UniProtKB/Swiss-Prot annotation:
The keyword Ribosomal protein applies. The lineage of its organism: Bacteria, Pseudomonadati, Pseudomonadota, Acidithiobacillia, Acidithiobacillales. It holds the Pfam family Ribosomal_S14. NCBIfam families: PRK08061.1. This is Small ribosomal subunit protein uS14. It comes from Acidithiobacillus ferrooxidans (strain ATCC 23270 / DSM 14882 / CIP 104768 / NCIMB 8455).
Length: 61
């Protein structure tokens, strides 16, 4: 879990828009972020395997 201060800091609008960065909606992680889903790779994997994300199916061939 990310520090609460960093999560709050990322939610504020920065002085310069170049400084803005994404964080996971669930855990607040900043790295490994999937823009399309708004989740980090860990939360994405957990929710995809649980079937919480519609349209995502585990690949098998």
């Amino acid at each position: 879990m990310a520090k609460k201060s960093l999560i709050a800091k990322s939610e504020r609008t920065p002085k310069f828009k170049v400084r803005a960065y994404h964080r996971c909606k669930l855990c607040g992680r900043s790295r490994g972020y999937y823009r399309k889903f708004g989740l980090c790779r860990l939360c994405f994997r957990k929710h995809a395997s649980a079937g919480s994300i519609p349209g995502i199916v585990k690949a098998s061939w």
